[in-house]
A protein has these predicted regions:
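Short boundary/loop segments of OB/S1/cold-shock single-stranded nucleic-acid-binding domains
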Residues: 42-62
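Long, highly charged, low-complexity intrinsically disordered interaction regions
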Residues: 1-15, 23-26, 232, 242
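Structural detector for short beta-strands of small beta-barrel domains
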Residues: 58-79, 117
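C-terminal accessory region of SF2 helicases/translocases
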Residues: 601-693
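Inter-lobe coupling/hinge segments of SF2-like helicase ATPases
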Residues: 275-278, 288-611, 667, 671-675, ...
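N-terminal pre-Walker A segment at the start of P-loop NTPase domains
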Residues: 267-277
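Upstream accessory/linker segments immediately N-terminal to the RecA-like ATPase cores of bacterial MutS
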Residues: 74-264, 638, 671
Length: 693
């Protein structure tokens, strides 16, 4: 095996790795020895020195050594083995709920043992529940660990001990095999070598400060963080370079339709809308496909920006497709576009999963013939049987629901006669700048950072659930006395549509009883699309006073007369999602209110989060706070990019490095294309498929 590169050495060549273990390791993307070496510890335990039992404090993880005083099995409410050991400074009780006869026999009175675990304060002094322990024999010197003990991310059926043993073998192989140094010499100067960094992180010497590792500041970590962030940025540059190789139809200035629409509008676009439209039009005039992300806060007028971009393509006799994540939102877009485009003689088509038979067929024919110039729908518009006629622009609404993979698939679908469509992605979920720079480095970004005049900021209050009857009275007052409409949003922590629907139904029944004079509607994710549409339509037309809903109404529903929203259990949702929900009110000129109806007691984090919402109506401020409180993985969600999860890097902790990383990534991309490709393959093997799309 000498001299081989470790990315070519399969894990099956290690002692103890058979087919069953290979399959389990594959679940956490471990296939080669290099993969294993890059599978870094989540945290470390210090088992290198002994703690006197008498000095143990609750919450401290420690190794203790002592003589077994007694070991008993009790059969109270639950079968349990308790064992007491003493080191002269104090007595520790160890409790085990899963144990065997062999374990009990090994802990015979008079034996000496080592135990490692979290100290707790028990009825009779210090105790540990299910500590790891090892019997020492009678007089032997305790065998302590020589390095800090790593704790790895794992999967069902793969124990920490197994990963540690396999990693020991992998580290031994570093002496005979090579792991390729991929950083150019001018970057790696003065840094730890890769083998050095890996040895340090897998087996840190006891002299190393745990606090350095916990803060991510150790030179070994910085070496790998730099490499991982570079790989991430290089993958985005590769996607981008791939896009630049393609041709798009250049759509030069042709403003006749645009000017007609602007003249017919009862308002003037904001400065921010005009600026973003100009950025889009500049991109569309080029012969490479536009790839632009438009971020706009709730209610900032992204739909008008999309309409003006669409008119540029339609003026050239081309087609435009707009894809939204839900039928509800797609239908609303279709209605908006019809209102704007019908007077201009432009036909708007609509395609969704629920359309069947003749209706669907005739819509497909109208698209294929070019009779329909603007097509709005869900992902159904990109199914095989839909044929476009000169598709030049694809607009995707709500990027969070579509990953990078769908983004590329959709692009391929639109390719005709060697031309790729321009692509515009719109999101109402503001993304903090550092995250946007990393997760969307393959896109140009525009921000609509101004709300249209006449929008009233929503006043937000947090009220405990114990005052529920007061809130119900407030709903009655808003709907009857003030003639307004209200939302009551039910949330559940489980990602279960069924449980969420049941909770909403129970609340609906409760509110119908409490408010007999109101018409109360219900909408949730388990209802058929047609039922949902019917309820939403009657709410929009003012036939319902109060709408009980699950978080399905998070995006895009526009009812200007709704001025009050109650959100139950807001502590269960992220800030960005709460801000999205709150954006359903405050869409008219009247003062609007949002009540966060929380369950007591609230944790510290929940209190901080609800305070952020009370203090700010700015989606970008809220997104930055959400990032600080929850971290980047949750905010971006792997559902969305498939790559928010990093092995060593942490976008929040390492955000100061990102501008420099981007500069270095461009340098490697231009000067060292082979290393760039190898870095992407090392850290992001999944992405490599897409950068060749």
């Amino acid at each position: 095996m000498k001299g081989r590169l470790l990315d070519a050495v399969p894990l099956s060549s290690l002692t103890g790795v058979g087919a069953a273990l290979s399959n389990k390791l594959a679940k956490i993307n471990l296939h080669t020895v290099q993969d294993l070496l890059l599978h870094l510890p989540l945290r470390y335990e210090d088992r290198t020195h002994l703690y006197p039992i008498g000095e143990l404090l609750p919450g401290v993880y420690a190794t203790v050594e002592g003589e077994v005083l007694n070991c008993n099995i009790s059969f109270g409410g639950r079968r349990m083995m308790t064992c007491q050991i003493s080191d002269g400074s104090g007595i520790l009780t160890m409790r085990f709920f899963n144990f065997s006869a062999a374990m009990k026999n090994s802990l015979a009175t008079g034996r000496r043992g080592l135990a490692y675990g979290e100290a707790k304060r028990g009825k009779y002094g210090a105790e540990m529940i299910h500590p790891e322990y090892r019997v020492q024999g009678d007089l032997s010197t305790p065998e302590l660990q020589e390095t800090l003990t790593p704790v790895y991310p794992t999967t069902e059926g793969v124990k920490q001990a197994t990963l540690r043993k396999l990693t020991d073998q992998a580290l031994d192989l570093l002496d005979t095999c090579a792991i390729e140094e991929l950083l150019p010499p001018e970057l790696s100067q003065g840094m730890m070598t890769l083998p050095e960094a890996l040895r340090t992180l897998h087996r840190p010497p006891p002299t190393l400060q745990l606090s350095d590792l916990e803060s991510g500041q150790h030179p070994a970590q910085r070496r790998l963080i730099l490499e991982e962030l570079l790989a991430h940025n290089l993958s985005m540059l590769a996607l981008r370079a791939g896009a630049q190789r393609f041709h798009a139809q250049p759509l030069s200035a042709n403003d006749a339709l645009k000017n007609k629409l602007l003249a017919a509008l009862p308002f003037k676009p904001t400065g921010a809308q005009a600026r973003v439209v100009a950025e889009i039009e500049r991109d569309m005039a080029l012969d490479v496909p536009m790839m632009r992300l438009v971020q706009g806060d709730v209610g900032s007028g992204k739909t008008l920006v999309a309409a003006l971009a669409a008119l540029r393509a339609i003026a050239h006799g081309k087609q435009v497709a707009l894809m939204a994540p839900t039928e509800l939102l797609a239908e609303q877009h279709a209605n908006n576009f019809r209102n704007w485009f019908a007077p201009l003689g432009i036909e708007v088509g609509w395609l969704a999963g629920k359309q069947k038979g003749k209706a669907r067929l005739s819509q497909q024919e109208a698209i294929a013939s070019g009779q329909v110039q603007m097509i709005v729908g869900t992902h159904a518009i990109f199914q095989e049987q839909v044929q476009f006629n000169g598709l030049a622009l694809v607009i995707i609404d709500e990027q969070h629901r579509f990953g990078v993979h769908q983004r590329l698939a959709l692009w391929e679908k639109g390719q005709q006669q060697g031309f790729h469509p321009h692509q515009l992605i719109m999101t109402a979920t503001p993304i903090p700048r550092t995250l946007a720079m990393t997760a969307y480095a393959d896109l140009d970004t525009s921000v609509i950072d101004e709300l249209p005049p006449g929008r009233t900021p929503v006043t937000t209050v947090a009220i405990p659930d114990t005052r529920r009857t007061d809130i119900i009275d407030r709903v009655r007052h808003a709907c009857i006395t003030e003639g307004r409409q209200a939302y009551w949003v039910c949330t559940l922590i489980e990602e279960s549509e069924l449980l969420e629907a049941q909770a909403a139904e129970a609340t609906w029944e409760e509110l119908k009883l409490a408010l007999p004079e109101l018409n109360v509607g219900l909408v949730h994710g388990r209802m058929k699309p047609a039922e949902k549409q019917a309820v939403m339509a009657s709410f929009k037309q003012g036939e319902l006073h109060l709408l009980v809903a699950t978080t399905v109404i998070e995006v895009g529903v526009d009812v200007p007369n709704a001025s009050l929203m109650i959100i139950e259990n807001p502590e269960r949702l992220g800030l960005a999602q709460l801000h999205q929900l709150r954006g359903r009110v405050g869409r008219g000129a009247v003062a609007s209110h949002c009540v966060l109806l929380y369950k007591t007691p609230l944790s510290n984090t929940a209190q901080i989060r609800l305070q952020v919402l009370r203090d700010s109506n700015d989606g970008f401020v809220i997104a930055q706070k959400d990032l600080e409180i929850r971290g980047p993985g949750e905010l971006l969600g792997t559902r969305q990019t498939g790559n928010a999860e990093f092995k060593v890097a942490d976008l929040l902790r390492d955000q100061a490095m990102i501008p420099e990383v981007q500069r270095l990534a461009r340098h490697i991309h231009e000067r060292y294309p082979q290393q760039a490709k190898a870095l992407i393959e090392r850290w992001m093997p999944e992405t490599e498929r897409y950068s060749n799309a």
